[in-house]
C-alpha cells in the first residue's frame, strides 16, 4: 500500500490454530492495566481495525466493554485507572453494588471494585487475517505459506533469510511475529522469553443463556487472589470462553500435545469460577 516490496512467510497456512490468532473472538482492551505505554499502540490498532471493518462487509471488531473486578486498591485496577488518566481513556469505576445491579451474572464481594473499560471488546481474528492477507496480495505482496524460516542474519547492508528448504531471501527490514517460536528465532539475543502452556475453555450455558450474550455481558476478568486472575468472554456463538490468566508451565511448541486436556485444567478453572 505504501509502495514497498514485501514478502511474507508463515510455517503454516493462515489463518490457522497454531498461534494466538484464532478462536473466533479475541479480547481487545484500551485502558491497559499492564502499563500506559501500551495505549498508543492500542489506539493505532483500534484505528486499523475500524478502518478494515469500514472497507469490508465483515465483522472485524465489536465494542462491548471490558470489566476488571478485584479488591479495592489492587494493582490491576490501579493500572487501568493510570492508563485512563495518562491517555484519557473512557472508564467507569464501579462499586460492588453497581456491578450487581447492572449485570445479573455478577455477585462480587463488598470489598471488591470494578473498572469498566468502555472501549473493551472483541476482535474476530479469522476475519482480520483473511482480509489483511487478501488486501496485501492485492497490493502486490508475495506470500509464502507452509514455509519455515530456519535462520536470519542482519548486517550493515541488509537482512538475509534462509528457509528450511534451502531458499535464501534478502531485504532491508525484517519484522518477526512468530508467536511461540519467537525464542527459537531470537535465541542469539538471549532475551528472557519462554513459552507457557495456556488452556482455554468454551462452556455452553444450560439456563438463562441470554444473559451471557455480548449485548448483556462485557468481557470480564476477576482477580481471585493477589496477582492471579481468570478472564471470561461472552458467547459469540461458540460458547462462553473462560481461562486462567497465565499460571501455565513452560513448553516447547514443537513437542506440545495441543489436543490433550488434563483433568486438573478444567477442575481448577471450575473451582475458581
Please describe what each predicted stretch is.
Residues 17-25, 106-107, 246:
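Short, flexible, mixed-charge acidic loops at enzyme active sites
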Residues 25-102, 112, 230:
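Dinucleotide-binding Rossmann-like beta1-alpha1 core, especially the glycine-rich loop
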Residues 71-145, 151-157, 162:
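Flavin (FAD/FMN) cofactor-binding and adjacent substrate-gating region
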Residues 2-5, 57-62, 168, 173, ...:
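Active-site substrate-recognition segment that forms the wall
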Residues 123-209:
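Predominantly flavin-linked oxidoreductase catalytic cores and closely associated redox partners
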Residues 51-61, 83-90, 139-142, 155, ...:
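Surface-exposed helix-capping loop/turn segments at secondary-structure junctions
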Residues 22-33, 248-256:
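Short glycine/proline- and charge-enriched loop/turn segments
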Residues 2-21:
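Glycine-rich FAD pyrophosphate-binding loop
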Amino acid at each position: 500500500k505504501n509502495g514497498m516490496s514485501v514478502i511474507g512467510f508463515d510455517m503454516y497456512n493462515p489463518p490457522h490454530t497454531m498461534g494466538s490468532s484464532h478462536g473466533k473472538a479475541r479480547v481487545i482492551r484500551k485502558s491497559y492495566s499492564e502499563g500506559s505505554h501500551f495505549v498508543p499502540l492500542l489506539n493505532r490498532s483500534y484505528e486499523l481495525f475500524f478502518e478494515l471493518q469500514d472497507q469490508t462487509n465483515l465483522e472485524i471488531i465489536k465494542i462491548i466493554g471490558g470489566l476488571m473486578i478485584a479488591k479495592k486498591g489492587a494493582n490491576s485496577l490501579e493500572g487501568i485507572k493510570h492508563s485512563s488518566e495518562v491517555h484519557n481513556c473512557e472508564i467507569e469505576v464501579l462499586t460492588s453494588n453497581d456491578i450487581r445491579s447492572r449485570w445479573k451474572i455478577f455477585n462480587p464481594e463488598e470489598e471488591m471494585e470494578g473498572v469498566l473499560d468502555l472501549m473493551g471488546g472483541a476482535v474476530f481474528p479469522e476475519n482480520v487475517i483473511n482480509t489483511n492477507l487478501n488486501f496485501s496480495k492485492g497490493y502486490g505482496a508475495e506470500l509464502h505459506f507452509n514455509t519455515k524460516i530456519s535462520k536470519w542474519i542482519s548486517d550493515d547492508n541488509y537482512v538475509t533469510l534462509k528457509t528450511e528448504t534451502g531458499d535464501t531471501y534478502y531485504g532491508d527490514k525484517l519484522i518477526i511475529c512468530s508467536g511461540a517460536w519467537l525464542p527459537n528465532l531470537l535465541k542469539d539475543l538471549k532475551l528472557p522469553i519462554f513459552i507457557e502452556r495456556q488452556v482455554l475453555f468454551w462452556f455452553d450455558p444450560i439456563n438463562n443463556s441470554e444473559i451471557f450474550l455480548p449485548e448483556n455481558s462485557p468481557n470480564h476478568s476477576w482477580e481471585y487472589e493477589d496477582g492471579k486472575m481468570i478472564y471470561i468472554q461472552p458467547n459469540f456463538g461458540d460458547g462462553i470462553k473462560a481461562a486462567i490468566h497465565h499460571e501455565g508451565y513452560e513448553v516447547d511448541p514443537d513437542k506440545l500435545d495441543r489436543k490433550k486436556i488434563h483433568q486438573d485444567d478444567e477442575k481448577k478453572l471450575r473451582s475458581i469460577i
